[in-house]
Curated annotation (Swiss-Prot):
Higher taxonomy: Bacteria, Pseudomonadati, Pseudomonadota, Alphaproteobacteria, Candidatus Pelagibacterales
Catalytic residues in the record: C380 (nucleophile), H513, E515
Protein's recorded name: CTP synthase
Additional notes on this entry: CTPSs have evolved a hybrid strategy for distinguishing between UTP and CTP. The overlapping regions of the product feedback inhibitory and substrate sites recognize a common feature in both compounds, the triphosphate moiety. To differentiate isosteric substrate and product pyrimidine rings, an additional pocket far from the expected kinase/ligase catalytic site, specifically recognizes the cytosine and ribose portions of the product inhibitor.
A GO cellular-component term linked to this record: cytosol
Gene that encodes the chain: pyrG
The UniProt record lists the keyword Heme: no
Amino acid sequence: MARYIFVTGGVVSSLGKGLSSASLAYLLQSRGYKVRIRKLDPYLNVDPGTMSPFQHGEVFVTDDGAETDLDLGHYERFSGVSAKKSDNITTGKIYSDVLRKERKGEYLGKTVQVIPHITDRIKQFIKHDSSKEDFVICEIGGIVGDIESLPFVEAIRQFANDVGKKNALFIHLTLVPYLKASDEIKTKPTQHSVKELRSIGIQPDIIICRSERPIPLDHRKKISLFCNVDIKNVIETVDVRTIYEAPMSFFKEKLDLQVLNYFKLKSKKPANLNPWKKITKIILHNKKQVNIAIIGKYVELKDAYKSLDEALTHGGIDNKVKVNLVRIDSEKLKISEIKKKLKNISGILIPGGFGKRGTDGKIEAIKHARLNKIPFLGICYGMQMAIIEFARNQLNLKNATSSEFDKKGLPIIGLINEWTKDGKKIKGTDKDLGGTMRLGSYDAKLKDNSKISKIYKSKLIKERHRHRYEVNIAFKDKFEKKGMIFSGLSPDNKLPEIIELKNHPWFIGVQFHPEFKSRPLAPHPLFSSFIKAAKNHK
C-alpha cells in the first residue's frame, strides 16, 4: 500500500512547495523507494492551457497530452519520473466532473454538495493509480486560509482518516521572515499559519521553514513548542544559489530520514548526492560562459519559460560552461537596435508563443542569426517564424505568413484543416481554444545524415507538442531547393517537425518542445548541441 505525503503552504505563496516536494521525492528515490508526485490546484480553470503566462507561468505538457502546472516540470526534472494526466487536478476539473455526473443523474437525485461530493472526487484523484508506488507526494496549491483551497484541505484531512494516520504525513511549508530593520527572524507568521491549519483539523507532522538566513536553535525550539511539532521535524531551508542545491539542503537537514522514521521505515540503500554536487559545482564555479538571447514576449516573467531556462542550464552542465540568459522583449525590439543588442550573443533562441504581438522583432532576430552565422534554435512558434523569414527573404514570397495572425497572406503556416495539398486555403471549424491543440508526445522520423539525426543519434524520436498551427508541407520542395532542409517529418510524411539550414554552422527549428524532456542528470541532446555550438561560436 502506498503512503501519502501532503505538502501545504502558509504565510505567502511561491515559497517553493514544488521544489521541496521534488527534492523530497529524489531523496526518497535515492533511498530505494518508488515515488509519484501530484499537484492539486485550487483555481477554477479546468487546466492552465488558456491562461496567460503572466498569470500562471509556463504550461507544462506531459507525454499523454495534459496541459499542467509548471511544478510538474520540477517533479520530472528532479525525480526522473514522467508525469501523467492523472498527476494534476484543478478545482475546475473537479467541479466539471461532479456537475457532469449530476446532469447524468448519477447522484440519484441527491443534493450535490462540497462535502461529500467534491471532497470525495478529490480523494479519488489522490488515490487513483497509486497502488504500485511506495510514496505519493501531493502538493496543495495556494496557501492555507485561501477560500479556494478549503475543499482540498478538507479532502486531505478526510483522506488521512480513511487510510489511517500511520499511512499519511502532513508537511507544512512556511515563511520565517528576516526583518532587516531590527535584525530579527520572526516565527509568529509560522505560528499563525499552523494555527490556521489546525483550525481546519490538520496537525502538521513536519514544518519546513523557508528563510533567507539560518534559523537559530532557540527559534526552532519556539516553533516546535507553539506548533506542537518535534524539534527534529522543524526543518530549515535557507535560500540557495541554484535550485539544484535544494536536495542537498534537505539531505543535510535529514528531511528524508524524518519521513522514513514517521512511517517506521528504513533506508533500503545509502542516498547518493554526488550527481547533484557535481552539477551545482559546474553551475556555480565554472569560469567559461556563453550568452544566450531568449527573444519572446513573456520574458518579463521568468516562470513563463521555466523549462526552457532549465534545459539551457542542463546544456551548459553537459558542456561544463555557465549559461547566461539575456532576455529580450520581442515587442520592444527595434530593427535599428538588433545589431547592438545581439552584439555579445553566442546563440539566439526563439521560444514558443501565440498571436501576432512581437512577431516582427522575432523575424528580424532570426534574419540576423541566419546572415551572421549565429547558432539559432527555434522552438514551436520559433520554428514557424524561421520558416516565414526564410520564405520572405530567400524564396521571395513577400506575403508569406501564418493564418494565426494574418488571414489575407500566403499561409505558409496554418491550421492543419485550413490548407490542402496544393496550399490553397479551406475553411476551418470553430472550436473551444482548449480543444484544438496538438498535445502530448508524437513520433518524428529523421532524415539520414542530417544534422538533427547526428544530434539525436537516432532515426526515430518521440517529443512533446503543444500547438494548433503547422508548417504547410506543400512548400517543402521550394524550401529545400534554397537550402532549408525539412530534416524531420511525422511518420506519415504530412507534417514538418524539424528544419535546418544547409549552409549554416547551427540553425535548427523544431515544431515540438524539447525543453519538457530535459533533466539536470540527463540533458536533452538538442540543448547540449546548441550550447556546444554557442560555446564554439566566435
